[in-house]
Amino acid sequence: MAAKDVKFGDSARSKMVAGVNILADAVKVTLGPKGRNVVLDRSFGAPTITKDGVSVAKEIELKDKFENMGAQMVKEVASKTSDVAGDGTTTATVLAQAIVQEGMKFVAAGMNPMDLKRGIDKAVVSLVGEIAKIAKPCATSKEIAQVGSISANSDSDIGEIIANAMEKVGKEGVITVEDGKSLNNELDVVEGMQFDRGYLSPYFINNQDKQIAALDNPFILLFDKKISNIRDLLPVLEQVAKSGRPLLIIAEDVEGEALATLVVNTIRGILKVVAVKAPGFGDRRKAMLTDIAVLTGGEVIAEEVGLTLEKATLDQLGQAKRVEVGKENTTIIDGAGEAATIQARVGEIRKQIEEATSDYDREKLQERVAKLAGGVAVIKVGAATEVEMKEKKARVEDALHATRAAVEEGVVPGGGVALLRARATLENLKTDNAEQEAGVKIVLRAIEAPLRQIVKNAGDEPSVVVNKVLEGKGNFGYNAASGEYGDMLEMGVLDPAKVTRSALQHAASVAGLMLTTDCMIAELPEDKPAAGMPDMGGMGGMGGMM
């Protein structure tokens, strides 16, 4: 086991604070509408340029092990806030640094760190309650666009495109972000349910211009096994042929004789049919087939529930207004399922989302909800260079998370104003002793830090602005983008309540742990002896001449 270096008391804390300051100083230059960029070196390819706090934080590794521990703890604040709220990482870092710096003064003065932490925790609980009271619901498209713009560092185009996307696919819809091909941002909306499986044979194509197979008012056969024997399929095919409507077959696979017969029938014009593989794998495939059945008002023909392909009837088939099948995707538009059944299925999947343990499962379940409930919107990010594309894409993703958070818990006045207005709740807060009261004072001072940093980055005098904002009431604040004072909500400077709350909670949690630290242990770097010359066989023991 390697030898360890141990530091106690002030020498440990001073090292930790130094690490906190290095990381926070690098991150906080990005805060606010006039925040600056940070350039990150890459071992290959062009450097990355970012204004995203968590991206900067993740890059920082310090040589000094004790300083690095402090930096890593603040990094945890940024990444945790990013995970929960999707934005507010810089605000969280600034708050953590402020609480640590203020708190260390009291610790150095000999106060009990545990009571200070209890005071900080009480203050934060009180502030979080007040932020929830201040929050207003974020319902209109205009408010969603404003939240998106602020989060994307005052880029109104990004805010508007996100608001449009949410309007088209609903608040629950899936919105994905991809690299675009042009210089401008574009929005593509896929209506209906789309899944990533295409036609099994190009002979099914009936629209040569678009290279798709389009079926109007088709029946939809859902089968959970492979279809290779045409005899099993014949009864259904005959019933569909009599009805004169096209047929979409979704099965685990359609192969051999069955596929060949379907292709021949299509080419001869006897029956308009398209076969595709079922989406997903294993249990997820079964679930997705059931989703399609609910959406189209059909049943999954599965042997485990006593249904067989040869006995399938038209009543068991799903229906839709239109189906488009491309090489890689199938889209079912306007399924014939009943609204109440679809809503019940959505509710069922939402319960699974609450119980899901992994992010991957949660994401896949949310996609299924969106496909049933609304649709899927794709924002294609446009930029002139790859470096700009990466930076812009990260901002769009941040803005998307922020707007979702705003819809969830409402909005508060932005620019650090919400925290200053919530401080009124701390003035009459009851504490058990003077040291806990000092903990409350630490938070009172720290919640000014985000506004101070925004003003500093804008090139103005922080103390003057903070005093003027404190003199005002309600939503009165300072708009750093225009240099004006006024009603923050009217000026469109909004923050999601969830982002402000998460930033404060995570900052206080980690900063409280740092204040109560009295010992730090790190591995000592090993001094490796210089390697001797290798044994030069046959030269009579001249090996270790070094």
Curated annotation (Swiss-Prot):
Pfam families: Cpn60_TCP1. InterPro entries: Chaperonin_Cpn60_CS, Cpn60/GroEL, Cpn60/GroEL/TCP-1, GroEL-like_apical_dom_sf, GROEL-like_equatorial_sf, TCP-1-like_intermed_sf. It is found in: Cytoplasm. One of its GO terms (cellular component) is cytoplasm. Keywords: ATP-binding, Chaperone, Cytoplasm, Isomerase, Nucleotide-binding. ATP binds at residues 30-33, 51, 87-91, 415, 479-481, 495. It is an enzyme of class 5 (isomerase). It catalyses: ATP + H2O + a folded polypeptide = ADP + phosphate + an unfolded polypeptide. One of its GO terms (molecular function) is ATP binding. Disulfide bonds: none annotated. One of its GO terms (biological process) is protein refolding. Its EC number is 5.6.1.7. Forms a cylinder of 14 subunits composed of two heptameric rings stacked back-to-back. Interacts with the co-chaperonin GroES. Belongs to the chaperonin (HSP60) family. HAMAP family: CH60. Together with its co-chaperonin GroES, plays an essential role in assisting protein folding. The GroEL-GroES system forms a nano-cage that allows encapsulation of the non-native substrate proteins and provides a physical environment optimized to promote and accelerate protein folding. NCBIfam families: GroEL, PRK00013.1, PRK12849.1, PRK12850.1, PRK12851.1. This is Chaperonin GroEL 2. The lineage of its organism: Bacteria, Pseudomonadati, Pseudomonadota, Betaproteobacteria, Neisseriales. The gene is groEL2.
